[in-house]
Amino acid sequence: MAWWLQNNLRMIQNNLRDIDAGMDVDAWFAEIESSHCNCVMVGAGGITSFYPTNLPYQTRSPYLKGDLLGEIVRVCHAHGVRVIARFDFSKTHERLLAEHPEWYYVSEAGEHLHYNDTAATCVCGEYQQRLSIEILREVLENYPVDGIFFNMFGFQTKDYSNVEHGICNCPACRKAYLDYCGRDLPQGQDWKTDETYAAFKEQVVGDLLLRIRRAVKAINPEVAICTYHHKGVDIIREESNSAVDRPLPFFLYSASENCQSAAGSWGGEKTMLNCAINAVDIFYRFQGVSPELTKIRLYENMAAGSQLDFCIIGDFADYPDRAGVAAMREVFGVHARNEALYGKFQSLARVLLYRPRKGDPEYLGWFNLLKDGHVLFDVLDHPAAVEHPERAAGYAALIVPDPARAPAAMLRAAREGGAKLLFSGLVDGEATEALRLLGVEWRTTLRNTRAAYLSTADKTRFPSFPERDWVILDREFGVFSGAQGALPLVHSAMFGPPERCFGHETGEERGLLRSADGTSAAFAFRLGRLYHDYGYADHRLLALDALRDLAPEAFLLRTNAPTCVEVFWNGLPDGRMFLQLLNLSGFNGVTVEPCIPVPNVEICLPCAVTGVHPLEGAPQPAVEAGGAQTRLRFAPLARYQAFVLDV
């Protein structure tokens, strides 16, 4: 087995600055060793070389006196710590621009992208297409690093101040796009939504990563390749980060979402490193986020079956935020003491959630509501659904946000495997396969439903609404004919002044469609987006009632836990089971403070549990066995508690 498939890393990335080229490696490693760390990521080449490069298109750090990369590899390997070398080919020192302007990004206005003393390169240019591989070759032939990582890989159009500079118009891009589709590059704002250009970018990035893979593996097949992409890599990297200008709502499940999307899509083939970025933002690299947020992100990493990854800027010696480092060490210690249990989980989930694209709010809303509703589920990312549609088989239910993008082969595999299909955001006629499966025809789309409602008067289908008959609707609503349905549309009426607030009429339109054979259902509005944006429990309850009505076997465990308790339940290779409870209290929507112990939590599991073994001295839960079910009653929950279950 390749070393990265062991899925047990506790990695620290010191994002090296030029001035760190002269750091005290022994003092640095003492910090690494005290952090239970078994892998480091350090700067090697690209923008700055942290070793004595002989290549004219690299720039050595002016503070480099010896060979920092060589020293780090020597010290780390002497103590059994792996080293992943970091490269950033997105920029070079600007001195090279005058000699080779063809390597660099060019805006629509014909301008290069400068930032401080660097200039942005283009992924289509010779520097990234050919010379980057020569830089990798120089490192791999001279240093026994365990892996390589590429930062800011692909088509980069924003600078560090988050300013958008637009599509690259360099000669290499223009030629490559013309060869790809016979057209000129899209201009203005059109490039952001142009599907042909998006496919072109994916092909360019994927082809380059595959060429890099062939070159790297020819030198040393044991070197792991890692970046923010799935193509040609051994380790997919993502980040749980923060940004001061990022719109609310704050997505607390970031680490779980990143890890679950990789595990469900590429498990057994690739592993994931989801980096808990300590910095508040790129602008504020020297203050960390709340230490409690760092703990949540790292605990979610390991609870979701992934590895640990933490990043700070520069060396520990002059890093001014020791609180975040202490939080990291707490979680790394838990993982290190129980390493044999982590990274080898076997999913018990009966629900599969399709991810149409990263960051899609309809999808994120469904991720949120399933987590909040304590439904166990896996995630299948769109590229994996295209390459491996068979991975959708074997579930009780497949949930499909953005039905128009869903691959037909994935839907077919899910149905043939016995899954019921639940579509969400079916608001127009573009999702032809979903319409066929539902047996409906699209009539029209209501673009503005502000002040409209959905009726939950049918309490047999919507038992979660004993005292509430209307639930708010907003944004688009699809009108269809030919299907059975529920959730009648209550049309908008007057909403002001109070004396005129009447006149609502219930129409024939339905918010929940269902096929005649009972194998498919669809929300004719963006339910996930409403939950993502507004957070009303009503939309979560609509979703869970509909899912329970469609596929009751999708619900494995029962619990009275509040939404602030994230539940993970998996199988272990030896036949035992692993239950993890993450207390997310202390989060008020923006601020993350220490958690409040959550009392009186009970979980009912659909199996006979014969023994419970708490980790890290957690209190023993009360066990009530009853045939094929077991009820566990827990002492007040701390931030993270885990239990090995004999079954």
Q: Which residue ranges define each predicted feature?
A:
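Mature N-terminal, pre-catalytic/accessory segment of carbohydrate-active enzymes
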Residues: M1-F50, N54-R86, E222, K344-L348, ...
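N-terminal small/glycine-rich loop or linker at the start of catalytic domains
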Residues: M1-N15, V106-A120, G267-I282
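Carbohydrate-binding surfaces of carbohydrate-active enzymes
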Residues: Q6-N8, V83, D190, D194-V647
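Conserved, mostly hydrophobic/aromatic
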Residues: M11, I32, C76, S132, ...
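Short, acidic/polar
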Residues: D18-S34, Q128-V139, S290-L298, A385
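Aromatic-lined carbohydrate-binding/catalytic grooves of carbohydrate-active enzymes
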Residues: W28-L68, K91-G110, H114-N116, T157-N169, ...
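Proline-aspartate-enriched helix->loop->beta-strand connector
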Residues: C37, P144-V145, F153, P221
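Active-site-adjacent "subsite" loops/lids of carbohydrate-active enzymes
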Residues: A85, F89-Y143, C173-E202, D207-R211
